[in-house]
């Protein structure tokens, strides 16, 4: 899984919308598995790269959760029996098993977000892009998101997530890309990226609180949990 972070206006959403042709480059090339993005329509690319909009209302348009789940797979020619099998699994995964016949706009804001996530996963793309999935989520929602990302990874899918929630980022992603003003400033393992204090300041990214405390205390190690902080603290105290 990969997280893309940076301040508002850094270009995060713009760049990921190029990954399945929602946007097209005005210069240069965007290659997906070596193929130019301009070689296919957005509809064709949706089989490869699924994009979950930040605002669910921009994505939902049918009269039931079930129909939202069925729509994409039908458009790409997925067999009906496979669609029905996937509905069972996806509905359970996103927590909407008992709400398949509800109108999406009768769902809570959190449930609507999971409805859009489910609709994209239904199409079985090789990569799934989440745009600010934690926005408006409670603790239970974040736990469910973590499980969704874990299962996607387990199934060999690439998960790319845009997020301002640094706690969620460090808990769930090993590779981090930092953007600022349309440029990639950092791209690497989470520990290395959050060790680049000055570059993070330039990109207006604030590390998780415990990480900031450790850096302020002069720790050379980059820590993300209280347990890791205390371990380093005790080791330093012992010296």
How does the language model describe each region?
Residues 28-36, 45:
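Conserved ABC transporter NBD signature motif
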Residues 199-239:
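ABC ATPase nucleotide-binding domains
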Residues 181-182:
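Conserved ABC ATPase "signature" C-loop
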Residues 81-99:
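Conserved ABC ATPase "signature" region
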Residues 163-164:
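H-loop/switch region of ABC-family ATPase nucleotide-binding domains
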Residues 20:
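Helix-to-loop junction immediately C-terminal to a conserved catalytic motif
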Residues 103-107:
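Conserved ABC ATPase signature
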